[in-house]
């Protein structure tokens, strides 16, 4: 549990105490995003993909900060309320999960291969056109949108890249970066009597971003909270 919760990072500097309720609900989750591999080459790939996921998280944070500010000549992308690339608004869901506990089993060894059917609940970060064409036919995840402009995931993610950089690629041939967004505007709480979780309205609660490498999402993932 602690290993998973350590991956939930607030992009506003808030304490992880805010996630105490979530911690209780996810007490059965005991996975780690840093498996031990034999061989220097595999360790290098592991470290590289985790570094890439962290970079993607920072890109999302910068985008959230830019959109949260009012529009100005120096910040034309300002909207007055932050959102994650691909969201129409901060309370828009991306992918197939409406609450963080829905992801619990998925990140507990269930979704562990790029062609798993669970991938249908996820979206490509930079678009499938940037994926390894040898494996595109095996992927179950799809593009968030193929349009351009506000709310188009791949387009908005690419805004954080330099012209020379290009989409960030997984070091694994079968890998590809995917994501889901738990919508803001709500809070998941636990009923102390039943142990069941429920969603309540919370206007000040931001979205939660989960990024993963499709090579093995149960091992390579990161969680970012925008509360």
Where are these predicted regions, by residue range?
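N-terminal leader/signal peptides at the extreme start of proteins
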Residues: 1-12
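Extracytoplasmic/periplasmic/luminal assembly and interaction segments
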Residues: 87-103
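Intrinsically disordered, low-complexity regions enriched in Pro/Ser/Thr/Gly and acidic residues
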Residues: 101-227
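N-terminal signal-anchor/signal peptide hydrophobic helix marking the start
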Residues: 14-23
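Residues within membrane-spanning alpha-helices of integral membrane proteins
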Residues: 24-25, 52
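C-terminal juxtamembrane segment of a hydrophobic transmembrane alpha-helix
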Residues: 26-44, 64
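Membrane-proximal amphipathic alpha-helices
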Residues: 42-53
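Alpha-helix exit/C-cap motif
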Residues: 58-90
